[in-house]
Amino acid sequence: MVYCPYNKEHKMLRKKLQQHILKCRVIYKDTVELMVCPFNSSHLIPEPQFFQHTQSCEDRNIIVHYQTSAPAVLSEDTRHAKIESEENWDDDESVPDYDPQVYCSRANIVREPNGLFPAQRRAFIEQEKRRHFGEDYEEEKKPRKAKARADLRPTPYEHRRPYSRRQ
């Protein structure tokens, strides 16, 4: 259990400290002036004790150890000699660039007409059918639906005469 740096009566688990500090900082922003430790942001110290804390902070050892340790030395086993290549693919200009649209139009791939207007979509689908089934593909005409008998009968509202006032 740890205590809140703003109010010693607040006691909580260490994992809840950061969340609690954010709340207390808003509440006590005008009354208590605390400085944040450069090694651990959960350490909030009054200004007179700040210098002493930075000298004796337990999280300072991580930084000091990093600063005083010798840099890593690569052994000869891990160094690789530079390999020179005889060919450079960037210099070869005889090969055309890859174009995915051209590839898809030639390969046996089903493409989707995304982002097209309805008329363009119908033309695209028709073109794709011709591409997949060959040039001898004939467009199948969809038969129109015949009107049902119920559609041919007049509704009761069609035979009514316009409303006239009684006299």
UniProtKB/Swiss-Prot annotation:
Keywords: Metal-binding, Nucleus, Repeat, RNA-mediated gene silencing, Zinc, Zinc-finger. It is found in: Nucleus. Zn(2+) 1 binds at C4, H10, H20, C24. One of its GO terms (cellular component) is nucleus. Zn(2+) 2 binds at C37, H43, H53, C57. InterPro entries: TRM13/UPF0224_CHHC_Znf_dom, UPF0224_FAM112_RNA_Proc, Znf_C2H2_sf. PROSITE patterns: ZF_CHHC_U11_48K. Changing C24A: Decreased transposon silencing but no effect on nuclear localization or interaction with piwi. A zinc finger (CHHC U11-48K-type) spans 1-28, 34-61. Residues 128-167 are annotated as: Disordered. Residues 128-161 have a biased composition (Basic and acidic residues). GO terms for molecular function: tRNA binding; zinc ion binding. Disruption phenotype: Mutant females are viable but sterile. They have small and severely deformed ovaries. Soma- and germline-specific transposable elements are severely derepressed in the ovary. Ovaries lack a follicle cell layer and show misexpression of orb. It comes from the Eukaryota. The keyword Zinc applies. Changing C37A: Decreased transposon silencing but no effect on nuclear localization or interaction with piwi. GO terms for biological process: negative regulation of DNA-templated transcription; oogenesis; regulatory ncRNA-mediated gene silencing; transposable element silencing by piRNA-mediated heterochromatin formation. Acts via the piwi-interacting RNA (piRNA) pathway which mediates the repression of transposable elements during meiosis by forming complexes composed of piRNAs and piwi proteins and governs the methylation and subsequent repression of transposons. Required for repression of transposons and neighboring genes in ovarian somatic and germline cells. The zinc fingers are required for transcriptional silencing activity. Belongs to the UPF0224 (FAM112) family. PANTHER family: GAMETOCYTE SPECIFIC FACTOR 1-RELATED, GAMETOCYTE-SPECIFIC FACTOR 1 HOMOLOG. Interacts with piwi. This is Gametocyte-specific factor 1 homolog. The lineage of its organism: Eukaryota, Metazoa, Ecdysozoa, Arthropoda, Hexapoda.
